[in-house]
């Protein structure tokens, strides 16, 4: 309990799943702490930022990745940023769990073929939450 969780999801490409991201983050926050709550902000702007702003985002996100206890990523929507975050997490040996809806995407072979990552397909939120309970060692 009280794990620091880095939640990753496609911000610029996954707008249709912002509500899902919000629900996942809220669920995790019941017992643990999500460092990246902004990913589930249903009111966030996805406009392109300045290079300076993007540099600040990079510095903050990589600091959070180094600080976290575990990475949970929703990868239904392909994202260069999430892919980078996953590689960074692997570099720092953070336990990393990838979720995706099999009916909505074909997950990259670069992720599926990497034995480092724990990968789960899911059908609905309840399936996803059950896996999160196991990952976070909750008494389900």
Outline where the language-model segments fall.
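Conserved catalytic or regulatory cores that recognize and/or transform ribose-phosphate-containing ligands
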Residues: 1-140
């Amino acid at each position: 309990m009280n794990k620091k969780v880095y939640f990753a999801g496609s911000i610029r490409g996954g707008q249709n799943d912002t509500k899902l991201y919000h629900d996942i983050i809220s669920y995790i926050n019941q017992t643990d702490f999500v460092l990246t709550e902004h990913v589930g902000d249903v009111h966030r702007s996805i406009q392109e930022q300045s290079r300076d702003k993007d540099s600040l985002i990079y510095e903050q996100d990589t600091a959070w990745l180094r600080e976290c206890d575990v990475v949970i990523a929703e990868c239904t929507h392909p994202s260069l940023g999430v892919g980078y975050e996953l590689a960074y997490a692997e570099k720092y040996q953070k336990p990393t769990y990838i979720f995706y809806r099999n009916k909505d995407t074909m997950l990259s072979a670069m992720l599926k073929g990497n034995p480092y990552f724990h990968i789960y397909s899911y059908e609905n939120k309840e399936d996803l939450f059950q896996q999160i309970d196991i990952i976070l060692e909750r008494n389900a």
